[in-house]
């Protein structure tokens, strides 16, 4: 029963890591990355469709994304969706593909993005701490119901804290790496 609590907490913390990685992928670092377009949805035959489902996204150069629609008739819709997105990148339509040239980041933009990364990282740590609190509460409930002894509770709390510390360290590492990537010129 005690292992189930730890496993559930680990699983939820892993989901937090994956969510953080997705969020970091959407923060542009001055170089082309297909995950920049993950949040772009295109109105395609009346249905909001993720861009990566109706077009291939390639990276021919370090700061260029090439969007090639599977259906050429959707080119205008894709261009409209890219213009409406908050990417800050102007699409160039040449009739068959759309080029997105990622502008070099200014020093001020880099600092702003680094602040955003810290904020997102901090939110992920708060989520992990909430998971820890839930796991601790569950362990205390089991001890109250006499399913585990007081000694087992203490051991379980230590194990939960260790899992939490590992998760927070992983988040700190991810945040530091993303900040370093952003501040590189």
Swiss-Prot record:
<dbReference type="GO" id="GO:0006415">
    <property type="term" value="P:translational termination"/>
</dbReference>
<dbReference type="InterPro" id="IPR002661">
    <property type="entry name" value="Ribosome_recyc_fac"/>
</dbReference>
<dbReference type="InterPro" id="IPR023584">
    <property type="entry name" value="Ribosome_recyc_fac_dom"/>
</dbReference>
<dbReference type="GO" id="GO:0043023">
    <property type="term" value="F:ribosomal large subunit binding"/>
</dbReference>
<comment type="similarity">
    <text>Belongs to the RRF family.</text>
</comment>
<keyword id="KW-0648">Protein biosynthesis</keyword>
<dbReference type="GO" id="GO:0005737">
    <property type="term" value="C:cytoplasm"/>
</dbReference>
<protein>
    <recommendedName>
        <fullName>Ribosome-recycling factor</fullName>
    </recommendedName>
</protein>
<dbReference type="InterPro" id="IPR036191">
    <property type="entry name" value="RRF_sf"/>
</dbReference>
<comment type="function">
    <text>Responsible for the release of ribosomes from messenger RNA at the termination of protein biosynthesis. May increase the efficiency of translation by recycling ribosomes from one round of translation to another.</text>
</comment>
<keyword id="KW-0963">Cytoplasm</keyword>
<dbReference type="Pfam" id="PF01765">
    <property type="entry name" value="RRF"/>
</dbReference>
